[in-house]
Amino acid sequence: MSPKTETKASVGFQAGVKDYRLTYYTPEYQTKDTDILAAFRVTPQPGVPPEEAGAAVAAESSTGTWTTVWTDGLTSLDRYKGRCYDLEPVPGEDNLFIAYVAYPLDLFEVGSVTNMFTSIVGNVFGYKALRALRLEDLRIPPAYIKTFQGPPHGIQVERDKLNKYGRPLLGCTIKPKLGLSAKNYGRAVYECLRGGLDFTKDDENVNSQPFMRWRDRFVFCAEALNKAQAETGEIKGHYLNATAGTCEEMIKRAVFARELGVPIVMHDYLTGGFTANTSLAHYCRDNGLLLHIHRAMHAVIDRQKNHGMHFRVLAKALRLSGGDHIHGGTVVGKLEGEREITLGFVDLLRDDFVEKDRSRGIYFTQDWVSMPGVLPVASGGIHVWHMPALTEIFGDDAVLQFGGGTLGHPWGNAPGAVANRVALEACVQARNEGRDLVREGNEVIREASKWSAELAAACEVWKEIKFEFAPVDTV
């Protein structure tokens, strides 16, 4: 070894591997208002102490690597490292812990969900010393929130654009989701909108296939909603799915939608990616388009209880990235969603300030500092008998979306839309009169069906349909 090399090695650097907890487990740390805080559900491998597991998460998602490196001495690790500052056992579990990690804000690029997730939910999820790892919640500090545009418009601006107040909005996903020609697709859109719905929707996998190219679909749907608007005197919308194989193609489709004069476009934000989604959200604000968001692929990420990422984190990320609507479960339909947990992330989407509430899965108080809210969309296996529960659960600021519950009506699409609109109006009126929709909901629907043959027919078709399975997602 040369004298020069010996001199370098003697200046405080000692090669080798040391426990993460010696550097990254800091229970004495006082979190800062500017820190991003994360709550991880950690399952260590047998023999790995929880302190080491929590410290490993902090290290591998910030500045650490598996061995000491001499370039650590060229920066201030105390300034930039993530810190596991608290650990708590999960009640009723032998080897499960909630690890709380604080990240200094300097680790993240401004206005980039992509960069934030690349660190916090990156390679650390494949770390061998952990049997499983799940990100349960994030606290996004106001200092970071202010670097994002957020939703293109938000709830109040959307209501003003549509001139619709005092009730949930009604939607319908056109079925079959694949296989219709553009003209027949447009016909279904027209029938639903003239029957009383506010919106119709492209399904998440309707993009530009051989049986229906995107441009043809856009033209026929624009014609349908213009005709329905003229007949009903109400503003109508159809979620034209702009999701595409490239960002350039996606923006081209959004530009064409704007030229057609439609009020809203749509994006699959997880399969399309956060960079694409944020770009589209910026375009929508600049050009007066509302943005509907579908969460296709979310269950791949969020349905396993001990590994992955909870949907409340994906919901927060969407509010930062930008969207005016997002699908968020129904509680009562065919898709996963426990009531209190669902309402927890619904509040995180809509409200300005949400208090910590572990009973609803909210690990941190979240201040959105006046960032516009996002309308939750309840969709999946719902029909007219669910209307009282949906009205009671979600209140006015939601979109209730009935696909099969509209198009499956025995008399056709327009009568299906009429049935849903009558049921909704009846439930809103009953609620406003002080009636208890939980106890009296079925009676409210029966009373309304006496005055609406369309609703009576829908009630008969779906009177026995239930989806009674225990939710996987529990606190």
Curated annotation (Swiss-Prot):
Listed GO cellular component terms?
chloroplast
Tell me where it resides: Plastid, Chloroplast
The coenzyme or cofactor needed here is: Mg(2+)
Transmembrane annotation, as ranges: none
Q: Which residues form the active site?
A: K175, H294
Q: Name one Pfam family in it.
A: RuBisCO_large
* Keyword Metal-binding appears in the UniProt entry: yes
Identification of the protein by name? Ribulose bisphosphate carboxylase large chain
Organism per entry: Gnetum parvifolium
| Gene giving rise to this polypeptide | rbcL
